[in-house]
Every structure is written in C-alpha cells, then in structure tokens.
C-alpha cells in the first residue's frame, strides 16, 4: 500500500498541471472501486476548477471550486497518471493495465492545454469521495489522524507521550494512524533499524522519564523524519503497483536496510535479517542490533 512518501510524490507530480485547471469531462468506466463513486459524480465535477491539490496522511485532496473536495485514497494498487494527445506513458501502451483505468478526467490548464488525468487500480481497493470542504477535517477518515512525521510538533517528546501505558509493540503503535499519520510498514521497519529498536519492543519502554528513554525517543523521531524525507526525495518505493504520474518508478527500495532483506546480512553487523509476522504484517529486523 502506498505510504506517505508515495502519496506525496504523486501530489507533487500532479500539482503543477492540475492547479487552477478546469474539469471539462469525466468518464467513469465502472460504478465503484472499494466504495461506489459519489452519486452523479461526473455531472457534479464538470465545469469546476481544481483550486489546489493537498494531502493529509495517505489521502490526496483535490480542492474544487464550489467548496467541495475529492478525497482520494490509492488503496493497495491505485495510481494516478497524466497524459495528453502528445504524451503517452509506457504504462498507457500496456493494454493489460489500461483495462483497469476506472476514472478519466479531462482537464484544461490555464494556458489552454488539455490533459487526461487517469486513475488506474487493478485491485480496486482505492476510493474517491466528494466532501464539503468546510467539513473536510471533520470527516471520519481524517478527524482522528495523528501528527505527520514532517510536521512541526512531531518529536521524541510527542512519541513519549503517545507511548505512555502502551503495552503493545513499538511497531504496532507506530502503525496506528491516530498517533503517526501516513507512516506504514516499510518505513516503520527502516526507522526502527536505524534507531536500533526491535519492532517487538514494548512502546511503553520509551515513555519513562529517564534520560535513556528520552534519547531513544528522540532518536526514533529523528530517524522517522529522515526515512520519510529521503523516501520523498527518491520518489517513494516501487514494490508492486506503485508508480509516478508519468509511469516511472520510485527508487527508495534500492536503499532499504532491512525491509524485504530476510536472510541477508545486516548492513551494520552482518547478522542475517529476520522476518516475523506482527498482526499479519511482515517485520524485518536484526536481532543483534535491535533490542
């Protein structure tokens, strides 16, 4: 599933084209994705402008004229891409993939160019909702989200407060979107390895008032920030279906230290990387370095 860096990369790729563009036509190739498309979705979009493209956690936010916002989630395999009559991505030439183009929105930019904004989703686990902009952050999908790793208030102190009395694992708490919004399995594994913390360690152990616990929490917060920042600069991680809006791939997966490296040597100490299951998800870590 695309995590914060992948969604932010998509946002940046779309932003320069879609901002202030007018929606001139909408084509729905099916009635639903994970959820049904909003009622009269096409009719409600045509003629509006996309004022701004935002993001909250793993959600893309197309802020429209007339005070509504398209809330888009990529699910497991969703992707957005941009094409026009002169530009065709390598992706668009593959008919096997194009058959999963479920939503096509033609937009006209400020200088009169027309682009096709296309949503493709093989597994159809993504979705789009139309929400009143003034009620957007009260929506159930957004109103309980925690701080994002790159936000001003995200710190070791914030994590320590969040970890108080948490008997569950560090991995489990960090994946809780009400605590850290946008963080997912890949980047939690990477940040924990950099912090020398086991994914199985109880989160509460970093919540004490000792200098040692405070240092661990500060290190973890900084490493989460670093991993997310580096992943964004690398265009995210392309493992299965994720790609950029031009059809190209992210390359942060080539910098993984632990994720997907089961049995390979730890880059720090040479001990084989272990894979375990936690709540049905794979965790990769070094039993020697991470305690």
Swiss-Prot record:
Cited InterPro entries: DNA_glyclase/AP_lyase_DNA-bd, DNA_glyclase_Znf_dom_DNA_BS, Formamido-pyr_DNA_Glyclase, FPG_cat, MutM-like_N-ter, Ribosomal_uS13-like_H2TH, Znf_DNA_glyclase/AP_lyase, Znf_FPG/IleRS
Entry-linked Pfam families: Fapy_DNA_glyco, H2TH, zf-FPG_IleRS
Active site residues of this protein: 2-3, 58, 281
Cofactor note as given: Binds 1 zinc ion per subunit.
Cofactor needs: Zn(2+)
First and last residue of the signal peptide: none
SMART domains cross-referenced by the UniProt entry: Fapy_DNA_glyco (SM00898), H2TH (SM01232)
GO molecular function, one term: 8-oxo-7,8-dihydroguanine DNA N-glycosylase activity
Residues that hold DNA according to the record: 100, 123, 166
ZnF (FPG-type) residues: 257-291
Record keywords, A-Z: DNA damage, DNA repair, DNA-binding, Glycosidase, Hydrolase, Lyase, Metal-binding, Multifunctional enzyme, Zinc, Zinc-finger
Catalytic activity: Hydrolysis of DNA containing ring-opened 7-methylguanine residues, releasing 2,6-diamino-4-hydroxy-5-(N-methyl)formamidopyrimidine; 2'-deoxyribonucleotide-(2'-deoxyribose 5'-phosphate)-2'-deoxyribonucleotide-DNA = a 3'-end 2'-deoxyribonucleotide-(2,3-dehydro-2,3-deoxyribose 5'-phosphate)-DNA + a 5'-end 5'-phospho-2'-deoxyribonucleoside-DNA + H(+)
Residues in coiled coil: none
Recorded family membership: Belongs to the FPG family.
Role this protein plays: Involved in base excision repair of DNA damaged by oxidation or by mutagenic agents. Acts as a DNA glycosylase that recognizes and removes damaged bases. Has a preference for oxidized purines, such as 7,8-dihydro-8-oxoguanine (8-oxoG). Has AP (apurinic/apyrimidinic) lyase activity and introduces nicks in the DNA strand. Cleaves the DNA backbone by beta-delta elimination to generate a single-strand break at the site of the removed base with both 3'- and 5'-phosphates.
Subunit structure, as described in the record: Monomer.
Protein's name according to its UniProt entry: Formamidopyrimidine-DNA glycosylase
Gene from which the chain derives: mutM
